[in-house]
Design a protein with these regions (language model features):
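Residues in the short beta-alpha loop(s) of Rossmann-like NAD(P)-binding domains
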Residues: 28, 52-54
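Conserved core of the sugar-phosphate nucleotidyltransferase
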Residues: 88, 112-189
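A short, N-terminal amphipathic alpha-helix
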Residues: 30-46, 58
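Short, high-confidence coil segments that cap the C-terminus of an alpha-helix
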Residues: 44, 99-101, 130-131
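Catalytic metal- and UDP-sugar-binding loop of GT-A-like glycosyltransferases, i.e.
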Residues: 107
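N-terminal nucleotide-binding beta1-loop-alpha1 segment
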Residues: 1-18
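Short internal beta-strands
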Residues: 32, 47-51, 136
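Short phosphate-binding loop-to-helix
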Residues: 54-104, 113-114, 121
Length: 189
């Protein structure tokens, strides 16, 4: 049986909605939703929380996550990337935990509708198909890249982004293959 580690990240300093990860939705802090869902999963063995903010760490602990470290500030800036947060957590776990994990699932607090069924379905797909990684995606319901244009800054004219001419564009959107976009609610690897 594969051992699964859940990692829930939340940093301070949000510019769009200050303090968003601590904001209450139905009297529950946003950061608690993935912790609650992971706690109900059939497959997750341990939940760790990564943050640079002690108050968020305390909240995460109160909802059942372990908080073995405070995330270094260099991994909690506007320019920080998920990979650095993940590698920091994995390196810490590898160096400091006796138990070993086979799979990591990364759960974003900004997707509070992700529930234990979504998590278990993703992990079951991952196990069944022997995936190396898995990411959540969604079909674009409205904007197809075939209709994207770019602006020529010199002539101030638009031209198709993917095609040579506008006449090459399909008139019927139903004739286009569906396109999907990453919705990083969860990552598994």
């Amino acid at each position: 049986s594969k051992r699964v580690l859940a990692l829930v990240p939340a940093r301070s300093g949000s510019k769009g909605i200050p303090g968003k990860n601590k904001k209450l939705i139905n009297n529950i802090p946003l950061l608690a939703y993935p912790i609650i869902a992971a706690g109900k999963s059939k497959y997750i063995d341990k939940i760790i929380f990564s943050s640079d903010d002690q108050e968020m760490c305390d909240i995460a602990q109160s909802y059942g996550a372990e908080v073995p470290f405070l995330r270094p500030i260099e991994f909690a800036t506007d320019d920080s990337v998920r990979a650095d947060t993940i590698l920091h957590a994995l390196n810490y776990v590898h160096a400091n935990f006796k138990e070993k994990f086979d799979i990591l699932i990364f759960l974003e607090p900004t997707s509070p509708l992700t529930n234990e069924n979504d998590i278990d379905t993703a992990l079951e797909f991952f196990f069944t198909h022997k995936c190396q990684s898995l990411v959540s995606i969604m079909e674009s319901p409205t904007h197809h890249p075939e209709y994207a244009v770019e602006l020529d800054n010199f002539t101030k004219k638009i031209k198709p982004f993917l095609r040579k001419n506008f006449s090459d564009l399909p008139m019927n959107r139903q004739a286009l293959k569906p396109v999907y976009f990453f919705v990083v609610e969860l990552l598994v690897f």
